[in-house]
Amino acid sequence: MPSAFEKVVKNVIKEVSGSRGDLIPVDSLRNSTSFRPYCLLNRKFSSSRFWKPRYSCVNLSIKDILEPSAPEPEPECFGSFKVSDVVDGNIQGRVMLSGMGEGKISGGAAVSDSSSASMNVCILRVTQKTWETMQHERHLQQPENKILQQLRSRGDDLFVVTEVLQTKEEVQITEVHSQEGSGQFTLPGALCLKGEGKGHQSRKKMVTIPAGSILAFRVAQLLIGSKWDILLVSDEKQRTFEPSSGDRKAVGQRHHGLNVLAALCSIGKQLSLLSDGIDEEELIEAADFQGLYAEVKACSSELESLEMELRQQILVNIGKILQDQPSMEALEASLGQGLCSGGQVEPLDGPAGCILECLVLDSGELVPELAAPIFYLLGALAVLSETQQQLLAKALETTVLSKQLELVKHVLEQSTPWQEQSSVSLPTVLLGDCWDEKNPTWVLLEECGLRLQVESPQVHWEPTSLIPTSALYASLFLLSSLGQKPC
């Protein structure tokens, strides 16, 4: 399931910003020290409309690219809040069976979940007046910072953190999960048999969030030309680095090239995969299972056309990079850059390099029809939690992927419309021999934020689970495609 940190952050954001939804949540406690005011970020474009772009730190602050390189002004406090988040849930059930001979079997079960957290938070913001003063007093550093030069050469856009939601003191999160079960039976006859049993299991988890941790942030785009500026009102047409006249066409092509979904639509049309009436515009706008399936199917068809030996090489090495986050990020960055620029890509080491070798020509240029689906897959895998990635790496060594795929597909199909809460019954044929918290498929779904139950197997759908569940479906679909034997 989502971490205790993630769940609390989402609830606090909902209370502080309401329905505006423009605060970007920090995804883990490890990253809660990274997104400070004035911090510079790179935005990784999403390969699908079903998951959002991701921001990553470039290890620079605004002062690192300006002169004089003095500390930035302190951000101003625009409100302090005390938020308490307490959840207490209980599910109970009982069943009794009796036969003609008066034999009886009865049983009961109860599951309870509770969590609590109380925190003092504040909003810190860099005001427009502060930005104007800094622009007047500081100019771009010369020579240009080396990291900035690399980002310029790649044509990446840069963003600066302008506002944060920060804890004022240490926060303790407590989660308790309890299960109880009991059963009785009576079997009459020459030898009357009776039995009774009870069981109880409780799990408690405590997480401490240090004072000064960043829970969420807002960004503005940084503009760099002969002078620097901050774009406080978003404009998707603007680029961070002002292109020279000879580069304007290339930059424009790069911006449009970032829409990998359009490339996948093109692949699908070439192979007549979208003959069910979904054209490109509908595919981009349709937020339903049919749209998700069309995206993923366009990718898988290209992968299935590869020779079995190449597919196995890719699959084996994906299993390795799932356990090596830096390698996975390096491969995703390399493919993204190559797909956007259309030029050669630099070789990579290790399992990421082995995958890249399968996707390039002898000249070192990417084959877009092969690179785009793998880029899409990496984007889906990146949405998943570390626990899910580890489980998928293990599943690649078994034959359970297809059943896991069918179950996730069933959940997505039966939970529409996705914008509403619902309960979805799970077919026992897809659950395996043991359906409980230790089942890998259970954990995969639970990590998406879905609540599951053992008795009368069900999934309780939450709209907030759409992004991770869609990414899980896409990951399972494409990994299964790579493992399929040719027809």
From Swiss-Prot:
Changing K237A: No effect on pyroptosis. The chain crosses the membrane at residues 92-98, 104-109, 181-187, 192-198. Changing L292D: Disrupts intramolecular interactions and autoinhibition, leading to spontaneous pyroptosis-inducing activity. Belongs to the gasdermin family. Cleavage at Asp-276 by CASP1 (mature and uncleaved precursor forms), CASP4/CASP11 or CASP8 relieves autoinhibition and is sufficient to initiate pyroptosis. Cleavage by CASP1 and CASP4/CASP11 is not strictly dependent on the consensus cleavage site on GSDMD but depends on an exosite interface on CASP1 that recognizes and binds the Gasdermin-D, C-terminal (GSDMD-CT) part. Cleavage by CASP8 takes place following inactivation of MAP3K7/TAK1 by Yersinia toxin YopJ. Changing K249A: No effect on pyroptosis. This is Gasdermin-D. It comes from Mus musculus (Mouse). Changing C77A: No effect on oligomerization. Keywords: Cell membrane, Cytoplasm, Glycoprotein, Immunity, Inflammasome, Inflammatory response, Innate immunity, Lipid-binding, Lipoprotein, Membrane, Mitochondrion, Necrosis, Nucleus, Palmitate, Phosphoprotein, Secreted, Transcription, Transcription regulation, Transmembrane, Transmembrane beta strand. One of its GO terms (biological process) is positive regulation of inflammatory response. Changing K146A: Complete loss of homooligomerization, lipid-binding, relocalization of Gasdermin-D, N-terminal to the plasma membrane and pyroptosis, as well as loss of bactericidal activity. Partial loss of homooligomerization and pyroptosis. A lipid is attached at C192 (S-palmitoyl cysteine). Highly expressed in brain endothelial cells. The lineage of its organism: Eukaryota, Metazoa, Chordata, Craniata, Vertebrata. The modification Phosphotyrosine is found at Y38. The modification S-(2-succinyl)cysteine is found at C39, C57, C77, C122, C192, C265, C299, C434, C487. One of its GO terms (molecular function) is wide pore channel activity. PANTHER family: GASDERMIN, GASDERMIN-D. Pfam families: Gasdermin, Gasdermin_C. Changing I105N: Reduced ability to induce pyroptosis. No effect on protein expression. No effect on cleavage by CASP4. The record marks D88, G89, D276, G277, L310, R311 as: Cleavage. One of its GO terms (cellular component) is mitochondrial membrane.
